[in-house]
Amino acid sequence: MQSRRFMQVDVFTPTPTQGNGLAVVLDGDGLSDQQMQDFATWTNLAETTFIQSPTSPDADYRLRIFSLSGEMLFAGHPTLGSCAAWLAAGGAPKRFGCVVQECGVGLVEIDQTGPMPAFTAPATAVDALDPEQVERICAALALSRDRITRTARLNNGPTWQVIELQRAADVLAVKPFTTRGPEFRGVALLGQGGEADVEVRNLGPASSMSEDPITGSLNAALACWKYETGGWTGPKVIAQGTCIGRTGRVYADCREGTVWIGGQSHILIDGTVTL
């Protein structure tokens, strides 16, 4: 056991305490997978990260990401929040204005030169969502099929079962699942309009919560899908967490064929943890 630098960060919100909380252990070298999982479970946050020495010469650090139930290849708010913590702890990127994170999906760049930090969205695989699964989701959510405009199955590390509705108001009107099961993992809704350009909800998070406050990896997958299919053009402001009292804001843009996902982070706890 040793004392390690620790921070807790609120991510993807302009207002501290209104985003998605993240635990970050900055001195993560030497911990076993089980030790990291045990600590992540103990924090009871959606994700806990461990910053370690990189194995790639091009990376500034390696990031291990754990949910309450297991390790994740990639996640969005851990990417931005861990980067903010690393920089606040004195980290200096090898390339000016760009932090390079090594994680389960490879190297992810986090640009520091814009109005807010933004990461390059990982490649997203797009497949059809099985019609029978759409019916199961609609039945579980009491969702009328005539509200649906498109569906898709997206994968950028996590897998997302996406249902696009006509309007943001339709998204906000849906009640969360009353029953939980693996068939409803990663169910996401989106609709145009509302307080931002797009309203998003993650009703099947990997954590024990009924709804995730703000999900960077989901919004990255949605942005890749929508920009690549021509559904979105220009910068977009995405709201998430509205129904559970959060002010989540994700900023998406596509520049020269690369999708960027940005957001603000606030360090609310800075200290040490004994692990």
Predicted regions and their residues:
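Active-site proximal loop and beta-alpha junction motif in alpha/beta enzyme cores
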Residues: M1-F74, L80-L275
